[in-house]
Amino acid sequence: MMSRANSRFSCQRTWLLSVVVLAALWSFGVHRAAARVINDECPNLIGNRDLYKKVEWICEDCSNIFRKTGMASLCRRNCFFNEDFVWCVHATERSEELRDLEEWVGILGAGRD
């Protein structure tokens, strides 16, 4: 039979374990969200995340349309400055936005080696 002190201690351990597990899961989610907007190939990403998200959306749409493994990575390669990105713009039927997208890619990739 458990005493009242043992019962209280057991309850505290359960709560502590729950808090630790939730904190770990939250931390994992934050790291994944932060990693999503990090692209080492785009030197001007900081301060231009809104542009990055607009351009990246093309790659996400393209990947969802064709369901080809690695399609989004190919599209993002060299900070979107590649023929796969242009192909995805046309495949997602956004050809009329190509000039704006190319300008945004130029801003994101300015200073690239």
Curated annotation (Swiss-Prot):
It comes from the Eukaryota. The keyword Ribonucleoprotein does not apply. SUPFAM superfamilies: Crustacean CHH/MIH/GIH neurohormone (SSF81778). Residues 1-35 form the signal peptide. Pfam families: Crust_neurohorm (PF01147). Keywords: Disulfide bond, Hormone, Neuropeptide, Secreted, Signal. It is found in: Secreted. Disulfide bonds join C42-C79, C59-C75, C62-C88. One of its GO terms (molecular function) is neuropeptide hormone activity. Its main location: secreted. GO terms for biological process: circadian rhythm; neuropeptide signaling pathway. GO terms for cellular component: extracellular region. Inhibits Y-organs where molting hormone (ecdysteroid) is secreted. A molting cycle is initiated when MIH secretion diminishes or stops. This is Molt-inhibiting hormone.
